[in-house]
Curated annotation (Swiss-Prot):
It is found in: Cell inner membrane. Keywords: ATP-binding, Cell inner membrane, Cell membrane, Kinase, Lipopolysaccharide biosynthesis, Membrane, Nucleotide-binding, Transferase. Belongs to the protein kinase superfamily. KdkA/RfaP family. Catalyzes the ATP-dependent phosphorylation of the 3-deoxy-D-manno-octulosonic acid (Kdo) residue in Kdo-lipid IV(A) at the 4-OH position. One of its GO terms (molecular function) is ATP binding. GO terms for cellular component: cytosol; plasma membrane; preribosome, small subunit precursor. This is 3-deoxy-D-manno-octulosonic acid kinase. NCBIfam families: PRK01723.1. It catalyses: an alpha-Kdo-(2->6)-lipid IVA + ATP = a 4-O-phospho-alpha-Kdo-(2->6)-lipid IVA + ADP + H(+). It comes from Stenotrophomonas maltophilia (strain K279a). It holds the Pfam family Kdo. Gene3D superfamilies: Transferase(Phosphotransferase) domain 1. The gene is kdkA.
Amino acid sequence: MVAFDANEALTPCREGRGIGAILFDRERLRQAEVGLFSPQHWGSKARPVGEGGRGSAWFIDAPFGASVLRHYLRGGLAAKISHDQYLWRGSDRTRSFAEFRLMRALREKKLPVPRPIAAYYMREGLRYRAAILMERIEGVRSLADRALVAGRGAPWEETGRLIARFHRAGLDHADLNAHNILFDGNGHGWLIDFDRGVIRIPATAWRERNLKRLLRSLIKLRGERSVEDVQKDYARLRRAYDMAWNRGT
């Protein structure tokens, strides 16, 4: 867990029978309230994010800047039991607070990630719901989109070097897929979606697990491209990753 600092503010909140809290960046928000985490609150200023995810994210045109709101939803078999509720294990272990603080820690390491603005949870009994609000990186396209459009011309080497940089800092990304890697027109890259991610001592096992997950997503999202073409492009990514890792950059 990242230590609390002077730029964080924490305020309690209530919603119906729920009791919760909001963790926010005091440099971006003077105060925070539950409405920040509702797309209905923003009205026409909220637009659904179309790519990736489970329909749980919105672009927000907020007075404090272009932002992204994301609700935490469960996937797989767990979603059949409850699509948006998680077992309560304490505020510091909520998905939203953990991701907020992880993103802040990555930014402190000078890594290219969105700035977290606010995170909240709402608890009822032994269950809670959560959401996070972060800055939007504008003028970018995902690796998934770039691969479909540009194929071999997509930023494969840049992606390999970008991932190596995060791995060198100890980031074990829980969902490293082609939707969560973004590039702008100048070739600058970012990673997004750090839910369930952790900072740990760099080790081969989890680094390889991240990379294999990315390859699976590239194959799944390949469109009309052949698996062989995707594997060739991934080989370029992997060579660049290995070179950057071995150089310590």
